[in-house]
């Protein structure tokens, strides 16, 4: 299984595909066609983005050994050191030189982009649980707008406005502002738009603003991951103008853009959705959507059968739809139900291969569930934030709006699929596998109310470091050991950057965790505070390095990928059990915070692991954890709470309760 990459969210940012038009597609700029009109073209910075650096080999080896230190005993560590030495002076050196040479020949991209696509698209495991994460929206602040039809209409219109704004080049470029008072201003934007694209990044850099890569954005819409034998393909058809809607496992399509590229009137979209919500067709006996949850080779074979049974046109409609809107017929009970429903549901009402599914339950609870190969959390989060803001601040319809009087029976097409016996058998097998797997997944969440970002920053501590330290203490308390831990960090500051790994388990967190968990009475509050400060400093350094492309994980991954591509026998470093162990990420963590996000989550990446989605808010800390039967998520969260209580006690000068 592969490390999950949600992201470490850089605040707001955007991206568009090759040859994307830089100005409106049509004269259709009537009211409500765009959600913003940026004076700086969306892709203005893309050409001048800096390239993702390949770290020096000696730096990578040094960082790798530092990350291994807390996970190994002395004997194991010495062995790993030997493997590293011979790698650095031998085959590793050769591979590194070849990687650097290859990178010089491919200046249009990054050294990680190709191998990363390969890794995702060649993986044969189901995309459900193994790769696809979800992010759930907060409710609309105006409660009557959470009516399912109203919210579905508003979310759909806002999503299409985003699509139009992006393609017209009118979406604000995604920029990380270190000094927004200087760079996030109309004056600066008026100036920078006249700087040629080949130089624009430097102009932003001078005012401490970092434009982010937007190359992933064009795959947000009209895109699907197609199952193929041994390696899947990403398919995009940006000419298609229809939306795919799933309800009760039935498939419907209707156009949301007209022939001139204008958005179909919101009242018509509302009428079509109302028609679909009131359709009394029963759920199909063999729900096709289960197939998207299958092993990729099995699904590839079944898809071929589906095509040759006369379903080619219907599948093309599914694959090319702007996105997939899933309307669920039940309300959400609580946060745990929300997580299960948005992460996997019952398998009948999602097309898991779509670049994203927008899921809306009966009570208006809404989430984005996305396929991960095409893009990372940064692109999805920008879309997410803009859609939330637009749909709540300038909604297209109100709860009182009357749907248009239009004949939806003509406009809305229900897709029917011809199923052979082999396909029916395939769907039944997929359902059985799906149901059995989902039964094994536990999800639980906690909200720690004693404090958050504000308090921790006053204590001069990194809020993220404290959250990560809590996970280390919790695992130590629960299982008595320190294990491989993964935190995703975006490298979108670079052209075609993806993610880098932060390794939160360090000698500092191990020492600090042992002090808090095993012998708190032996240390004064001051000593415990000092250890926390050391952890925070080191975590801050690791985070900065990762964001700057100076981690070790992607570099070692790319060298391994290169060796495999060249048919070179796998170097010993990669056969070392310690390498296997550090990449068996028992704690897989990812943080997301945004005023639009209620919570996010994903499954563990290994069978004996935890999937930890978390957010440190101003005055509270939220944590959403998943596990399989080998681990206890509820108990882990109790240990996380205990760790946070202990740390807050120490910071307030109190003694730790045993």
Swiss-Prot record:
Inhibited by trans-2-hexadecanoyl-CoA. It comes from the Eukaryota. Changing residue 352 to C: Risk factor for IIAE4; 3-fold decrease of affinity for L-carnitine; lower thermal stability compared to wild-type. The gene is CPT2. Changing residue 368 to I: Risk factor for IIAE4; no effect on activity; does not affect affinity for L-carnitine; lower thermal stability compared to wild-type. Residues 179-208 dip into the membrane without crossing it. Residues 1-25 form a transit peptide. Keywords: Acetylation, Acyltransferase, Disease variant, Fatty acid metabolism, Lipid metabolism, Membrane, Mitochondrion, Mitochondrion inner membrane, Transferase, Transit peptide, Transport. It is an enzyme of class 2 (transferase). (R)-carnitine binds at residues 486, 488, 499. This is Carnitine O-palmitoyltransferase 2, mitochondrial. Its EC number is 2.3.1.21. The modification N6-succinyllysine is found at residues 69, 85, 239, 424, 439, 510, 544. Residues 26-178, 209-658 are mitochondrial matrix. It comes from Homo sapiens. Belongs to the carnitine/choline acetyltransferase family. One of its GO terms (molecular function) is acyltransferase activity. It is found in: Mitochondrion inner membrane. The lineage of its organism: Eukaryota, Metazoa, Chordata, Craniata, Vertebrata. GO terms for cellular component: mitochondrial inner membrane; mitochondrial matrix; mitochondrion; nucleolus; nucleoplasm.
